[in-house]
Amino acid sequence: RDAGVNALAPGELLRAIRIPADRLRRRTAFRRISLSPMGRTGALAIGTLTPGGGLDLTVSGGVRRPVRIAFPTLPTPQEAAQAVDAAIPAETWFDDLHGAPAWRRAVTLDFAAEIAAELGEPAE
């Protein structure tokens, strides 16, 4: 589905979201950027380590809908960036006053690499 489209019928309400407790205990890394300090998100990436040592990486903000990439093992920073680049077609990036597609793509690829590197370090 594209932005602004959901599965709710007219008059239906979302009353609850259930998140398994084990998901809330995972190690995470988060990156967000906008063109102004309090501006609309230009790019956003969230990574979580899976119990089996993999990485779930979700990209949002700069694309028409969230994109989730599941790595069975922790990727290198370069592998994470390459996987994001391969998973998101050029026409999927937003092109508006909050950021050009090339900028959104570039910072998102940097975020993917940073997240893989951060989560690859030992926990404090």
What do the PLM-derived regions correspond to, one by one?
Residues R1-E124:
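C-terminal structural segment of proteins
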